[in-house]
């Protein structure tokens, strides 16, 4: 035997019917589906006001409340239709009514605003609601968002920015509203419909019902967001397309005209460096000029007399200016190694046959102070050290700034003449 349920007092039903049902046009009152929508409004009013102000009234759902109204006003069903059947038809019809709302994003585009229904088992979803007769979609979205959050999106809404899905044969369109300050105060305008309003990080929301991201990061099961789940992945895709969250841009959600982020600058620097390497593969333009100048200098010594004069001048310079040369060359070892490591661009075929000679360019002797590599025929030139005293040179002198490759090298004038074909 079923326990007897508490009944809604007749006076309460009279007041509710006069407020929401009896005053509607006759053509709507004769339509049971339209009457059910008005009964739904009466049910919300009963929960918001009568239940709050009159203790002892029974708590009832929409089906029990609709049965009580139809029983109290039998003229609403003149043909004696089955109430359960009418309610099923009304529920099916409701699923076909489009719903419109908004996805509200903060200024960082990383957080989204969700609302929670009043009932204890209600989950989190986007503010939205069913469209009224002859109501424009964007007007419906603005109205529903204002009723559920107290925030007016009319100044933010763009009619072309929305995500539209069909869920269980019901059309749902949510307009995307970016750039709402996170410190905005939200206050629902309807009673007993919205319990909580909170910001949630988009990356912590689930994309499907088995996504356990909110469980690990928010401590909430994914089914708590079942009304929002269908929109999360399309929202991420929309943000990626609109604000360029791709590897090509390197600047997150920055706009097209903003300053490139550091990775972009570094990428440009690396590109310029690679380009310079292609233009000057063997070094800087100055290095190229020096290397080009060296063979020209080598060709300039055209006869034996000029070579002898140059060698004598070299001897005199080393006697008088040894100290200055060492002081003016702070990086002698590095410089000497660099010069020695440069290959000769033009070699006489005789060099290939006489591998033991390994001739050295004349300008190397003049440009480096690495060794005393002058011929010692007839006289022994004296070279001045940094300390000021002279030392006799026999062709095998060693100085602190000498190159290892030429410490034991003896200058052979005859070999040089052969190489120059003089």
UniProtKB/Swiss-Prot annotation:
Keyword Kinase: no
GO molecular-function term, one example from the UniProt record: 5'-(N(7)-methylguanosine 5'-triphospho)-[mRNA] hydrolase activity
UniProt cross-references to Gene3D superfamilies, sorted A to Z: Dcp2, box A domain (1.10.10.1050), Nucleoside Triphosphate Pyrophosphohydrolase (3.90.79.10)
Main location (coarse class): cytoplasm
Region listing for Disordered, in residue ranges: 247-347
Residues recorded as bearing Phosphoserine in the entry: 246-247, 249, 276, 284
Intracellular or extracellular location(s): Cytoplasm, P-body; Nucleus
Biased composition (Basic and acidic residues): 303-312
The protein's Enzyme Commission number: 3.6.1.62
Cofactor field: Mn(2+); Mg(2+)
Tissue-specific expression: Strongly expressed in brain and testis. Weakly expressed in lung. Not detected in heart, liver, kidney and muscle (at protein level).
Residues that bind Mn(2+): 144, 148
Ranges of compositional bias, category Low complexity: 249-258
GO biological process, one term: deadenylation-dependent decapping of nuclear-transcribed mRNA
One Pfam family cited in the UniProt record for this chain: NUDIX
Name listed for the protein in its UniProt record: m7GpppN-mRNA hydrolase
């Amino acid at each position: 035997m079923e326990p007897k349920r508490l009944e809604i007092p007749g006076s309460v039903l009279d007041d509710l019917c006069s407020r929401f049902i009896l005053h509607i046009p006759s053509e709507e009152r004769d339509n049971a589906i339209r009457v059910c929508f008005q009964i739904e409004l009466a049910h919300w009013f009963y929960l918001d006001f009568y239940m709050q102000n009159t203790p002892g009234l029974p708590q009832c759902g929409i089906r029990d409340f609709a049965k009580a109204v139809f029983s109290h006003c039998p003229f609403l069903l003149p043909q004696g239709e089955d109430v359960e059947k009418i309610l099923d038809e009304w529920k099916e019809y409701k699923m076909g009514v489009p719903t419109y709302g908004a996805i509200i994003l903060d200024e960082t585009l990383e957080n989204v605003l969700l609302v929670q229904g009043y009932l204890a088992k209600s989950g989190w979803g986007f503010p939205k609601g069913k469209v009224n007769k002859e109501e424009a979609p964007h007007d419906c979205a603005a109205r529903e968002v204002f009723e559920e959050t107290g925030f007016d999106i009319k100044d933010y809404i763009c009619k072309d920015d929305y995500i539209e899905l069909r869920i269980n044969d019901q059309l749902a369109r949510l307009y995307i509203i970016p750039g709402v300050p996170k410190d905005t105060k939200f206050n629902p305008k309807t009673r007993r419909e919205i319990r909580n309003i909170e910001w949630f990080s988009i990356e912590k929301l689930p994309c499907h019902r088995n996504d356990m991201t909110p469980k690990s990061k928010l401590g909430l099961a994914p089914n708590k967001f079942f009304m929002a789940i269908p929109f999360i992945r399309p929202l991420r895709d929309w943000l990626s397309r609109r604000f360029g969250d791709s590897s090509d841009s390197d600047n997150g959600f920055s706009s097209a005209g903003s300053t490139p982020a550091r990775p972009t600058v570094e990428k440009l620097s690396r590109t310029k460096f690679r380009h310079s390497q292609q233009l000057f593969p063997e070094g800087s333009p100055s290095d190229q000029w020096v290397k080009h100048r060296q063979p020209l200098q080598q060709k300039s010594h055209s006869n034996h007399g000029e070579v002898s004069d140059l060698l004598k001048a070299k001897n005199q310079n080393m006697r008088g200016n040894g100290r200055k040369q060492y002081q003016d060359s702070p990086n002698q070892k590095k410089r000497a190694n660099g010069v020695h490591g440069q290959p000769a661009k033009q070699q006489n075929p005789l060099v290939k046959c006489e591998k033991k000679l390994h001739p050295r360019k004349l300008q190397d002797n003049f440009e480096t102070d690495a060794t005393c590599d002058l011929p010692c025929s007839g006289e022994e030139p004296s070279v001045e050290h940094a300390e000021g005293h002279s030392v006799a040179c026999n062709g095998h002198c060693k100085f602190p700034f000498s190159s290892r490759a030429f410490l034991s090298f003896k200058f052979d004038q005859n070999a040089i003449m052969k190489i120059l074909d003089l």
